[in-house]
Swiss-Prot record:
Molecular function terms from GO: carotenoid isomerase activity; oxidoreductase activity
Protein name in UniProt: Prolycopene isomerase, chloroplastic
Cofactor: NAD(+); NADP(+); FAD
EC number of the protein: 5.2.1.13
Transit peptide: 1-62
GO BP term (any one): carotenoid biosynthetic process
Superkingdom per UniProt: Eukaryota
Family matches, as InterPro entries: Amino_oxidase, CrtISO, CrtISO-like, FAD/NAD-bd_sf
Assigned keywords, A-Z: Carotenoid biosynthesis, Chloroplast, FAD, Flavoprotein, Isomerase, Membrane, NAD, NADP, Plastid, Transit peptide
Tagged with keyword Cell division: no
Recorded topology in the membrane: Peripheral membrane protein
Family listed: Belongs to the carotenoid/retinoid oxidoreductase family. CrtISO subfamily.
SUPFAM superfamilies for this protein: FAD/NAD(P)-binding domain
Length: 615
């Protein structure tokens, strides 16, 4: 019988453990048990002035004595027999004030936290759940290690400036072993159109133009525009666009690149595509390309966002972290602690404390209050301003945001463990399926995204098995107003229908090969990811003016910042990591850890606010 993600009891566990110095090759528990609220279930021993469990073969981060600098290599995602204490809380009251509290430990929040910690700030991350990562977390069942969200990982290359995950890990002394994916996605589209997006751009271009030779020039020009934007972005040092000293410095160093980005800022991918391409089927293909990026078609997808993804997949490529996506958040959390900051789990923030118009702290579900100079919310803006802030009226800027953007639908997720022999030996890792009608692209359950991470990393599943991770859009309204029995029955029916479609299109015999099935609905994602309606993120209400209306990290409330996919530049791994970098830089400047000009700050923030009114 299928169950929702996390709806069955979890093993006591799932904390990241890494070696935290070169003193020993044994694996140590972080020497900050109060901060983590950890209670060891194993005997502990004393050595080198630190408490740690007796040596265990965790195999998470490995440190070599032969090198002066730690060489962290992720071997696998592991469970460790630890449990979290819900009644332990750090820094209660005003006896200890942090430089920043980060609400939530998604990738955006963790990047912001670690970047601040590296700059010297004292940061506390508060996570509602048992492990870090949010949508980039993981869970384990019966020997399978499942990624909670996407398994398509951008930003992991070793070159350029958009390899933001690599940079974030390196900043805190971690490096993860990755497996290059020879392709990004295999499209299976109406009229039996099949397009494989190869890692090498020239191979992808050749494949696409072989299907549409009459549009070769138009395809070349559209993707050429994408490369122009990507190359401009990739040449810049990426920091906060709300910090004028940095912004003007970049403009004087790279004026043409900055002007290129300014030109494309208010434009959408679909409009650019239509300048060069006339064939409606090619335009529909570009819609599908953009839908994966933004959950909307190309006419509603900002050109800058499309360019980041459509080019980085060839420039840096898709690289899967060995052991699973959950290792990214665990490594960042480990690095945060190594920098002297803290992370606390089972810490459910219920409200942000505002005094005299300034955000000064947070109140937890257990009534405890923790204070900081700055509060960074990694929740969506709907959760931040609709639930965490207890105000009668929305700030004007947030009111404008909610007029321009609505909550994108959530999704139905199906995690399968299947017998290996059901998949052909040359199966690609990622697939996008839209069988019959292009008009179903944005319809709930219309298209299916499928990842098979065990094609790249077989350690994620027991021998002789594969993992299939299936996504399709779904609205929370479809799952409300029914009894638990009807809810479970509907989950089973909808999941079986999706699986049957994949069986018919890709993998005959799929249904009978299933050894494990778990189904998550929008209600599941709302509960465990703490996202309003389980939303995937913001989507434009109408046709947007590119990214012009997307807010940055500062808010109308002094001392409160937002980070994540409802901030510039939006959804996706690169985008939220970029948001984290920008947020950390702006907060660091406000803390006096980076250069700052109060007069220029005020002028720039007013100017940016005015630009957003033009959207």
């Amino acid at each position: 019988m299928s169950t929702s993600i996390f709806e069955t009891p979890l093993p006591r566990s799932d904390l990241f453990l890494c070696s935290n110095s070169l003193l020993s090759q044994n694996y140590k528990l972080f020497d900050n048990s109060r901060s983590f609220g950890l209670k060891s279930l194993r005997p502990r021993c004393q050595k080198d002035g630190l408490l740690y469990p007796k040596p265990l073969n965790f195999g998470f981060c490995r440190v070599s004595r032969r090198k002066r600098k730690p060489n962290f290599v992720l071997n696998s995602v592991l469970s460790v027999d630890k449990e979290l204490e819900s009644d332990e809380t750090v820094g209660l009251g005003r006896s200890r004030e942090y430089d920043a509290i980060v609400i939530g430990s998604g990738i955006g929040g963790l990047v912001a936290a670690t970047q601040l910690a590296v700059k010297g700030a004292k940061v506390l991350v508060l996570e509602k759940y048992l492990i870090p990562g949010g949508s980039s977390g993981y869970y384990e069942r019966d020997g399978f290690t499942f990624d909670v969200g996407s398994s398509v990982m951008f930003g992991f290359s070793d070159k350029g400036n958009l390899n933001l995950i690599t940079q974030a890990l390196a900043a805190v002394g971690c490096k993860m072993e990755v497996i290059p994916d020879p392709s990004t996605v295999h499209f299976h589209l109406p009229s039996n159109l099949s397009v494989l997006v190869h890692r090498e751009y020239n191979e992808f271009f050749s494949e696409l133009t072989s299907k549409f030779p009459h549009e070769k020039e138009g395809i070349f020009k559209f993707y050429g525009e994408c490369w122009k934007i990507f190359n401009a972005l990739n040449s810049l040092e990426l920091k906060s666009l709300e910090e004028p000293i940095y912004l003007f410095g970049q403009f004087f160093k790279k004026p043409m690149e900055c002007l290129t980005l300014a030109y494309y800022l208010p434009q959408n991918a679909g409009d650019i595509a239509r300048k060069f391409i006339k064939d409606p089927e090619v335009l529909s293909f570009i819609d599908a390309e953009c839908f994966i990026v933004s959950t909307v078609n190309a006419l509603k997808t900002p050109m800058i966002n499309a360019s980041m993804v459509l080019c980085d997949r060839h420039y840096g490529g898709i690289n899967y972290p060995v052991g699973g996506v959950g290792g990214i958040a665990k490594s960042l959390a480990k690095g945060l602690v190594d920098q002297g900051s803290e992370i606390q789990y089972k810490a459910n923030v219920k409200s942000i404390i505002v005094e005299n118009g300034k955000a000064v702290g947070v109140r937890l579900a257990n009534g405890n209050e923790i204070f900081a100079k700055n509060i960074i919310s990694n929740a969506t803006r709907w959760d931040t301003f609709g639930k965490l802030l207890k105000q009668d009226e929305l700030p004007k800027e947030e009111e404008n945001f909610q007029k321009l953007y609505i909550k994108a639908p959530s999704f139905l997720s199906i995690h399968l463990g299947v017998k290996s022999d059901v998949l052909p030996p040359d199966t690609d890792c990622h697939h996008f399926v839209l069988e019959d009608d292009w008009s179903n692209l944005e319809v709930p359950y219309g298209s299916i995204f499928l990842s098979i991470p065990t094609v790249l990393d077989s350690s994620l599943a027991p021998e002789g098995n594969h993992i299939l991770h299936i996504f399709t859009t779904s609205s929370i309204e479809d799952w409300q107003g029914m009894s638990q029995k009807d809810y479970e029955k509907k989950k089973e029916l909808v999941a079986d229908e999706i699986i049957s479609r994949l069986e018919k299109k890709l993998f005959p015999g799929l249904q009978s090969s299933i050894v494990l099935k778990e189904v998550g609905t929008p209600k599941t994602h709302r509960r465990y990811l703490a996202r309003d309606s389980g939303t995937y993120g913001p989507m434009p209400q109408g046709t947007p003016k590119g990214l012009l209306g997307m807010p940055f990290n500062t808010t109308a409330i002094d001392g409160l910042y937002c980070v994540g996919d409802s901030c510039f530049p939006g959804q996706g791994v690169i985008a939220v990591a970029f948001s984290g970098v920008m947020c950390a830089h702006r907060v660091a400047a406000d803390l006096g850890l980076e250069q700052k000009s109060p007069i220029l700050d005020a002028a720039l923030l007013r100017l940016l606010g005015w630009f957003r009114t033009l959207a």
